[in-house]
Amino acid sequence: MPRTFEEECDFIDRLTDTKFRIKKGFVPNMNVEGRFYVNNSLEQLMFDELKFSCDGQGIGGFLPAVRQIANVASLPGIVGHSIGLPDIHSGYGFSIGNIAAFDVGNPESVISPGGVGFDINCGVRLLRTNLFEENVKPLKEQLTQSLFDHIPVGVGSRGAIPMLASDLVECLEMGMDWTLREGYSWAEDKEHCEEYGRMLQADASKVSLRAKKRGLPQLGTLGAGNHYAEVQVVDEIYDKHAASTMGIDEEGQVVVMLHCGSRGLGHQVATDSLVEMEKAMARDGIVVNDKQLACARINSVEGKNYFSGMAAAANFAWVNRSCITFCVRNAFQKTFGMSADDMDMQVIYDVSHNVAKMEEHMVDGRPRQLCVHRKGATRAFPAHHPLIPVDYQLIGQPVLIGGSMGTCSYVLTGTEQGLVETFGTTCHGAGRALSRAKSRRTITWDSVIDDLKKKEISIRIASPKLIMEEAPESYKNVTDVVDTCDAAGISKKAVKLRPIAVIKG
């Protein structure tokens, strides 16, 4: 017999002002406990979702996030805790905003496409400029239109980068080294990119022909949904040393934020792998609490093939953001009549928030090789970590947090506490509060546009009918999310950004 909401809550208790525990027994076969980070307002959303589920009200076909965190805690080989971040919301298998790490040395350990997501290496890139708001304001509409003209956006958009099938194979394996060779990126760009823009484990032969066909025309495209290019202004600086190290010197400075991923190619890689993993589960006797948690042993043929294909899709996403960066620099050059170099359009950083990585972490006092799944979660390594660029060794890895449309975004830095508690991971954005369907039912197109106009934000949209899905009301408050992570000590606020122009698919 299903438990009541009150009975469910008996398995959940508060550990600190920002951290809750999900005890073993909440769902069957939990190998570790669950943890999730929320403040008071985000806590209400989490428990309301669980209550609606107990009352028989659906949440878009997915289980509530609390239950998904617990189900992930039951996967074979998981270590530490199954962790939910403040922007968490229900997703396929894993919640978006769920982290889980699996011991590579344990032959039972698994890798799960649901722990990465369908948009492999969906991520964020931030470019700085030496322009200020007063320089851009007179040309803001012209710049917005130029960006819209230069960057292919929307469902089914085709890329501006000419590519042969042989080029695609190279970019899947070379990542940003391909864009550097072809002249689409600067040598400095890859130095400020997670994995330096290339996962070396990538194998293009593990990407299906169908996935390649989907990706071939989409290189250099933004796509639709919550993907965007934004011109932003530095609104507030919290950590002057960190900001200065990133080339952000004062309020009013103009930056550009890009949010996109691996397009149809990554989606197809995930779809293909789920079929293979279901076969592997039947063969190896792997039992999971939710069929959406399809997985395979990390060291099985299926597990290795998925990881190699996922790495190739991740490389495609870095190439995609690099090609869009090329388009952005061209749009700025056309608008302002200066070279991108003269405008100091350097990449501050590029982060992934949908990926699995092989990393070394301390577990029970000793180093272990782990497969860390980050779905809707951003790597946030601290100062002096060997995997972050030399330029950021003294401040920690920059972490880019995009807000919802028309709201602020943030730059954070990683912390030692985050490395200990969350495998060096923090939030990735605002996180949905309403389903896309409910957003379309309850929010009007006019109200969204009027709100942006009141904020003096220029906008260009390829798919106006989808704009209601991306309205700020559809998302959690990004400031709540970031402040919760800051209060919990898993990341530290450095800079707040506000948008002045938005390009959306």
Swiss-Prot record:
Keyword hit for Nucleus: yes
GO CC annotation terms, alphabetical: cytoplasm; endoplasmic reticulum membrane; nuclear envelope; nucleus; tRNA-splicing ligase complex
Active site feature: 428
Binding residue positions for Mn(2+) 1: 119, 122, 227
Record keywords: Cytoplasm, GTP-binding, Ligase, Manganese, Metal-binding, Nucleotide-binding, Nucleus, tRNA processing
Catalysed reactions, as listed in the record: a 3'-end 3'-phospho-ribonucleotide-RNA + a 5'-end dephospho-ribonucleoside-RNA + GTP = a ribonucleotidyl-ribonucleotide-RNA + GMP + diphosphate; a 3'-end 2',3'-cyclophospho-ribonucleotide-RNA + a 5'-end dephospho-ribonucleoside-RNA + GTP + H2O = a ribonucleotidyl-ribonucleotide-RNA + GMP + diphosphate + H(+)
Cofactor comment: Binds 2 manganese ions per subunit.
GO molecular function, one term: RNA ligase (ATP) activity
Annotated binding of Mn(2+) 2, by residue: 122, 259, 353
Cofactor entry: Mn(2+)
First-tier enzyme category under EC: ligase
Recorded phenotype for the gene knockout or disruption: Mutants are sterile and few are viable. Mutants have a slower growth rate, reduced lifespan and have defective vulval development displaying a severe protruding vulva phenotype. Mutants have disrupted RNA ligase activity which results in the presence of unligated tRNAs and defective tRNA processing. RNAi-mediated knockdown results in reduced sensitivity to tunicamycin-induced endoplasmic reticulum (ER) stress and significantly reduced levels of spliced xbp-1 mRNA under tunicamycin-induced ER stress and non-stressed conditions.
Function description: Catalytic subunit of the tRNA-splicing ligase complex that acts by directly joining spliced tRNA halves to mature-sized tRNAs. Required for the ligation of mRNAs and specifically, regulates xbp-1 mRNA splicing during the endoplasmic reticulum stress-induced unfolded protein response. Has a neuroprotective role in the age-dependent degeneration of dopamine neurons, which is mediated by xbp-1.
Any further remark recorded for this protein: Ligation probably proceeds through 3 nucleotidyl transfer steps, with 2',3'-cyclic phosphate termini being hydrolyzed to 3'-P termini in a step that precedes 3'-P activation with GMP. In the first nucleotidyl transfer step, RTCB reacts with GTP to form a covalent RTCB-histidine-GMP intermediate with release of PPi; in the second step, the GMP moiety is transferred to the RNA 3'-P; in the third step, the 5'-OH from the opposite RNA strand attacks the activated 3'-P to form a 3',5'-phosphodiester bond and release GMP.
Subunit and partners: Catalytic component of the tRNA-splicing ligase complex.
Entries under HAMAP family matching the protein: RtcB_euk
Name of the protein described by the UniProt record: RNA-splicing ligase RtcB homolog
Gene: rtcb-1
